[in-house]
Amino acid sequence: MTREEAWELLTEYNKEEFHLEHAQIVENTMKYFAQKLGYGEEKEFWGLVGLLHDLDFEQYPEEHCIKSQEIMKERGLEERLIHATASHGYAITIDIEPVHEMEKVLYAVDELTGLIGAVVLMRPSKSVQDLKVKSVKKKFKSKNFAAGCSREVIQRGADMLGWTLDDLIAQTIEALKTFQE
């Protein structure tokens, strides 16, 4: 599947600008991590996983990660793409556990990119470029701030990867700096 085909599929099921922007943020974050972790030859695939991870969320929020599997299977998409995107709902909506490092990264950064995005919006600069880990950690501890971003999932993702929370946050900030102002 090409990036263009993935975008067409995504926009068939998603119309809200917020969801489309989130998909692109996760896509680019996944590409950064592919390169960083030594999977450069799979960078585009990691990006597709990020782009399509919430394919079903807008239309089927109660069947998130379940409906997308059906949609992708109907389209004849490869099993590893289906498994990777579904696994980010592990212990939330589905029992498919992230196994590959790519799946663990997706699990960890999906919620975290949302939290970081909310932190950035509160900053005078409105930029990730001058964002520090301590600023994110402060808001991470405030459960009412960006309440829709599960701290438990973010921490579980860091644990799956064998990283500290600080390392996950720092690397995700670096990823976002590469493509955001």
Question: What label would you give each PLM region?
Answer:
Residues 28-35, 70, 74, 174, ...:
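A generic structural signal for well-ordered alpha-helical segments enriched in polar/charged residues
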